[in-house]
Amino acid sequence: MLNDVPGMMFVDHVAISVKTGELEGQAETYKALGFTEIHREEVYGGDQVREVLLRIGEGPNLIQLLEPLNETSPVAKLIERNGGRGGLAHVAFRVADIQTAFDAMKAKGINIIDKAPRPGSRGTRVFFVHPKAFGFLIEVVEEPAK
């Protein structure tokens, strides 16, 4: 179903939820494995997370660590549902044009959480696909114009 979405390019990143207070330790563990930190940000609005983005090798081989800023964060709720443990938060796919991908997925009847593409971290535009569609949460992301 995703291979029929116009402009679908590749896996952009895998997001991992981490418990409050564990972000720095997790980031250091990935750095010890050879990852390089390329971005760090606090994201407010509906997401309410502290994010560290790490890359290994060339290309978009990215891990995004997400720590909830408070108990109302969707990531805090995910950790709670996961028995108090961190783990897979979502898999993100890069697209060439976010609006085209959004419209194509809507036309296919895919259950999209967001009403429209919205700002994400790093200046990206994103939307999320409900986990019931594929068995896990999917983020669709368009990089900012350079």
Model segments located where?
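N-terminal beta-strand motif that seeds the catalytic metal site of vicinal oxygen chelate
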Residues: 1-28, 86-93, 144-146
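A cross-kingdom feature marking solvent-exposed beta-strand/loop segments within repeated
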Residues: 12, 38-39, 44-48, 70-83, ...
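Vicinal oxygen chelate
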Residues: 2-7, 50-55, 61-66, 93, ...
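Conserved active-site tyrosine of GNAT-family acetyltransferases
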Residues: 26-31, 105
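Ampipathic, surface-exposed secondary-structure segments
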Residues: 63-103
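Acidic (E/D-rich), amphipathic helical modules within compact regulatory domains
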Residues: 31-57
